[in-house]
């Protein structure tokens, strides 16, 4: 597929919200920064549209560029923050199940926050963006085996954190 202005506009409408969601999770839910990064991402994609390999799904290419943008920002001292939004402390709890669900969510959020960046990125791309192992490998430019081992380590670390911090 050749990326014309019309096809690119359609791709922006389809994938722009996913890109912004990815940036939201990776920047601690900073809406303005996420919007700016999404705009920068699509400007970058347009400027390098001739490099797009139509054999790959567009979202894999898009997340590759997005991941590299974040990596470059990180090198400039920007830290990757939240995956799951914080629980609003002032929000009343309606039922015990909701409280339990929010506590689990908060615990997982804390566990994800403590992951080393390589594990966190793999985890977020898999569970936040629903990319396959193969797509994550392409996005991060690492072998599939490395993706699997990072995912295994991330899941074990999250599981261990939750076991240690579970309240009875």
Enumerate the predicted regions with their spans:
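DNA-recognition helix of helix-turn-helix
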Residues: 134, 140-164
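A short pre-motif secondary-structure segment
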Residues: 122-126
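C-terminal flanking helix
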Residues: 16, 20, 42, 116, ...
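Internal acidic/polar
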Residues: 72, 80-105, 132
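Σ70-family region 2.3-2.4 aromatic/basic alpha-helix that recognizes the −10 promoter
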Residues: 16, 39-46, 56-79
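Short, small-hydrophobic-rich alpha-helical interface motif
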Residues: 19, 23, 34-45, 65, ...
């Amino acid at each position: 597929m050749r990326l014309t202005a019309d096809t690119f506009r359609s791709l922006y409408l389809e994938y722009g919200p996913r890109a912004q969601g990815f940036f939201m999770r990776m920047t601690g839910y900073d809406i303005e920064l996420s919007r700016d990064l999404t705009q920068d991402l699509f400007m970058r994609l347009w400027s390098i549209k001739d490099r797009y390999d139509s054999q790959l799904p567009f979202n894999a290419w898009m997340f590759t560029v997005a991941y590299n943008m974040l990596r470059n920002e990180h090198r400039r001292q920007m830290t990757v923050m939240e995956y799951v939004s914080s629980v609003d402390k002032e929000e009343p709890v309606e039922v015990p199940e909701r409280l339990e669900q929010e506590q689990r969510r908060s615990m997982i959020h804390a566990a994800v926050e403590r992951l080393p960046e390589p594990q966190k990125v793999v985890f977020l791309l898999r569970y936040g963006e629903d990319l396959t192992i193969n797509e994550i490998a392409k996005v991060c430019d690492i072998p599939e085996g490395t993706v699997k081992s990072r995912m295994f380590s991330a899941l074990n670390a999250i599981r261990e954190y939750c076991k240690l911090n579970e309240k009875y």
